[in-house]
Amino acid sequence: KDTLFPALAGHRPEIAGFFWFQGFNDQFGDAAPAAYEAGMKHLIHDVRKDLGAATLPVVIAGIGTFGWDGTAKPQEGSGTAKVLAGQLAMNDVPEFAGTVRAFETAPLSDKEAAAIFPTWQKNFEEWKKVGSDRPYHYLGSGIWYSRIGTAAGEAMVELVGP
């Protein structure tokens, strides 16, 4: 309502981009990982159709929960590898050229949190300074999440343009 934010009275918000940072639960089983690439493509089409924005910029943060040290790759043929491949494949869809950007998140890892994690229970006071969760949530590392957010923001700015 205009009464809640008077400075924005009459302003119509615009959705300028869409950010996808999901995929962990999709790596399990056989069906979801195998269908991830096709599903990702359908998601982009559906979001754009539903929002009436045929070229809406889309940024995808590829699953990276396997890559604590920043250099690891998911096990070949694993559900994780299939999900990540499906996410990154959106960079190569001709109709998405210049409007979709997917990037890997494992290289952005927090190496300090990764080094402490194996002994987090014994060194809890040290651990809670750098992490707050298990590996499937990027170690709960604010550094890792902020790097992902920065990379996503930079990718979106490139897609949206000046």
Q: Positions of the model-derived regions?
A:
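Cell-envelope and extracellular/periplasmic
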Residues: 1-162
